[in-house]
Every structure is written in structure tokens, then in C-alpha cells.
Amino acid sequence: MATFELYRRSTIGMCLTETLDEMVSSGTLSPELAIQVLVQFDKSMTEALENQVKSKVSIKGHLHTYRFCDNVWTFILTEASFKNEETTEQVGKVKIVACDSKLLSQ
């Protein structure tokens, strides 16, 4: 199964990468094993979001920038509002990256 490496830029992905780098630097972990952990992280995040997340959210905001390159859409919104059934959250600036899920099956 192919995966995207997008989730490595999330907070949890960056913390994992930083921890793995520290472990490789100290000799606790081999670089090859660290790469395997990151590949498994990519697969697990894709699977979890695909199978376990059931809630829906609507997003409104001012479109600052958009880009389409290599079947990947990137949107940067300012003054964004995220709304689900229970709550609304205001965010000053948000970057949304959307990939075609059909690319995963290639």
C-alpha cells in the first residue's frame, strides 16, 4: 500500500521525527529502523483517518492562496472557521493539503 508522507508535518509526526533523530544520534536506534518507524507511521495515520474518523466538519475562510501541482491541492485560508455539530473554532491562518486518494492505489 502506498502512502503519503503528509502526516510527518503534523505535530505528532514532527515529535516522532525529532525523537527518532535523537535516538539515532545517541546510537540507541539504527537509521534503517528509524526509517521503518516513519514508514509505519505513514501507513498507520492513513489507515486511522480512513477507517476511524467519522465526524464531518465545514470550513469557511478567506482564500489567500491556492495551488494545484502533481495532483495535490494546497489551500491557505485566513480567518478560517471550523464548524462541526457541537462547536465552532476560529483560526487565524490554516494550510489545507488535499491529495487524490486514487494515487494511493497505484
Curated annotation (Swiss-Prot):
It is found in: Nucleus. One of its GO terms (molecular function) is translation initiation factor activity. InterPro entries: TFIIA_a-hlx, TFIIA_b-brl, TFIIA_gsu, TFIIA_gsu_C, TFIIA_gsu_N. Keywords: Initiation factor, Nucleus, Plant defense, Protein biosynthesis, Transcription, Transcription regulation. GO terms for cellular component: transcription factor TFIIA complex. One of its GO terms (biological process) is RNA polymerase II preinitiation complex assembly. It holds the Pfam family TFIIA_gamma_C. CDD domains: TFIIA_gamma_C, TFIIA_gamma_N. TFIIA is a component of the transcription machinery of RNA polymerase II and plays an important role in transcriptional activation. TFIIA in a complex with TBP mediates transcriptional activity. Protein involved in the resistance to X.oryzae. The displayed sequence corresponds to the form of the protein present in strains susceptible to X.oryzae. Belongs to the TFIIA subunit 2 family. PANTHER family: TRANSCRIPTION INITIATION FACTOR IIA SUBUNIT 2. This is Transcription initiation factor IIA subunit 2. The gene is TFIIAy.
